[in-house]
């Protein structure tokens, strides 16, 4: 087991490796996020008093960001993205008309959204992951980027999914 100092050094080394080329790719983001989710709680009591969010409506903006990021990770054609996004939103909300596709989503924005969404009730988390899956499989083709981001999202929400094999073949 790591001491607090060893864990801090471990995190610093991971951050150094991730930032070495001044570009964070999706694999690096996923690694950082999974380590943060699983180990930070063991070395910090920061999340001990987090209240559960029980209304999906209160996290609509975060869901928009998350689904937009997944759509961008796997759908190269910009004209298709709003349609795929809408399919995911309709999985979550009965009134999906007010949902806004976010055309440019950074991994930092995804992190911010996940930091909020981690506090939603388990039933809502499952609904969010299901909407993410709808976006990923919409075109019956799963890219490596989509698979990695989906696994990071699901793991962050405490709803891990098995590894997905992305390929050049349609489902």
Model-assigned labels for residue ranges:
Residues 1-19, 23, 27-171:
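Small-residue-enriched hydrophobic alpha-helices in membranes
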């Amino acid at each position: 087991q790591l001491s607090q100092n060893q864990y801090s050094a471990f995190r610093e080394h991971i951050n150094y490796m991730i930032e070495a080329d001044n570009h964070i790719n999706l694999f690096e983001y996923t690694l950082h996020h999974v380590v943060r989710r699983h180990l930070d709680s063991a070395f910090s009591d920061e999340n001990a008093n987090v209240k559960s969010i029980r209304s999906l409506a209160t996290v609509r903006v975060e869901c928009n960001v998350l689904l937009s990021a997944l759509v961008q990770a796997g759908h190269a054609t910009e004209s298709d993205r709003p349609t795929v996004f809408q399919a995911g939103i309709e999985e979550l909300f009965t009134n999906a008309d007010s949902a806004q596709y976010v055309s440019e989503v950074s991994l930092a924005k995804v992190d911010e959204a996940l930091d909020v969404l981690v506090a939603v009730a388990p039933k809502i988390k499952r609904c969010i992951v299901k909407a993410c899956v709808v976006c990923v499989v919409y075109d019956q083709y799963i890219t490596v980027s989509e698979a990695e981001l989906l696994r990071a999202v699901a793991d962050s929400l405490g709803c891990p999914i098995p590894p997905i094999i992305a390929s050049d073949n349609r489902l």
